[in-house]
């Protein structure tokens, strides 16, 4: 089996204009900078995977900016639906590489694709707005997962926006997980011998969890971070966190995840308020 390499990025949070800012940073310049860095890498990845929150508010203007920025990539890009996205909008506005949809309706974004014999599955855990920011896998999505997560088959990698298992951070565990994440984890167990990893975003923090032989791996946001400490009852904007993406190698005998943090962009810093604070977590 030949190696496969990909870029994992997440939580770009495009706004309606390039001037849009969140947590004290303008997201558009960072996304553009990430694309430039990916195109300059000394190793050409096979694809880019964006695990959701392409936008902050799913407007045509925000998706148009995202489409324009990511069209400059030299390799195909794929998307998962974040809690700030809608699956229908991603279908409508964003171009992806070759894939096979797992469900025919445009209200769900779930699909598979294959690269050099490696199997990739994207799950849609975007639930109803009433449970936001938590996720939920529908019965249909659990059926898709169980059909893919069998003991035998090619190397398998899973992508979704939300974490499925506990992060040992009180607020995150109460508010950010997939409601039926334990059911998802149990569904994955038959495939753990060929499962290369479950990659997600949502938490704006580089985090790895290893449970029952399964690697769960989150990537930092491309522009703004959250704290996830085990003694926090409420998360905060992490102004010490660096923006980043991950360079992932799927080798015959191992999975390598290399975090690629990069320096803050002076031109992307948003003005602070008179009291010295930056925008809140949802601005």
Predicted regions and their residues:
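Active-site glycine-centered loops adjacent to acidic/histidine catalytic or metal-binding residues
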Residues: 11, 52-53, 82-83, 161, ...
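N-terminal active-site segment of His-dependent metallophosphoesterases
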Residues: 1-65, 108, 150
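Extended active-site neighborhood of metal-dependent phosphoesterases/phosphodiesterases
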Residues: 59-150, 180-194, 209, 220, ...
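His/acidic metal-ligating clusters that form di-metal
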Residues: 34-47, 133-215, 247, 276, ...
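Short glycine-enriched, charge-decorated loop/helix-capping segments at active-site entrances
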Residues: 20-26, 136, 170-176, 232-234
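A short C-terminal boundary segment appended to hydrolase-like catalytic domains
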Residues: 2, 243-283
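Active-site-proximal beta-strand elements of phosphoester/diester hydrolases
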Residues: 3-16, 117-127, 157-159, 214-221, ...
């Amino acid at each position: 089996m030949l190696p496969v390499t990909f870029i994992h990025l997440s939580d770009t949070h495009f706004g309606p204009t390039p001037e849009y800012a969140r947590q004290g940073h303008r997201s558009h310049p960072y996304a553009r900078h990430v694309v430039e860095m990916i195109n300059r890498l000394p190793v050409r990845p096979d694809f880019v995977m964006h695990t959701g929150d392409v936008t902050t508010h799913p407007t045509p203007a925000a998706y148009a900016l995202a489409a324009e920025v990511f069209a400059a990539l030299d390799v195909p890009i794929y998307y998962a639906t974040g809690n700030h996205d809608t699956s229908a909008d991603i279908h409508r506005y964003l171009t992806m590489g070759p894939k096979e949809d797992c469900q025919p309706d445009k209200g769900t974004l779930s699909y598979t694709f294959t690269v050099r014999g490696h199997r990739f599955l994207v799950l849609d855990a975007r639930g109803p707005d009433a449970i936001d920011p938590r996720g939920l896998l529908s019965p249909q999505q659990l059926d898709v997962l169980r059909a893919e997560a069998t003991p035998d088959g090619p190397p398998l990698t899973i992508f979704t926006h939300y974490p499925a298992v506990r992060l040992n951070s009180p607020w995150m565990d109460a508010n950010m997980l997939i409601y039926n994440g334990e059911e998802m984890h149990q569904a994955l167990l038959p495939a753990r011998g060929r499962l290369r990893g479950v990659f997600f975003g949502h938490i704006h923090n580089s985090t790895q969890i290893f449970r029952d032989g399964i690697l769960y791996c989150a990537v930092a946001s491309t522009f703004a971070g959250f704290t996830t400490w085990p003694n926090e009852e409420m998360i905060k904007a992490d102004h010490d966190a660096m923006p980043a993406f991950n360079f992932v190698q799927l080798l015959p005998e191992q999975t390598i995840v290399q975090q690629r943090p990069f320096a803050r962009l002076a031109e992307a810093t948003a003005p602070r308020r008179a009291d010295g604070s930056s925008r809140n977590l949802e601005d």
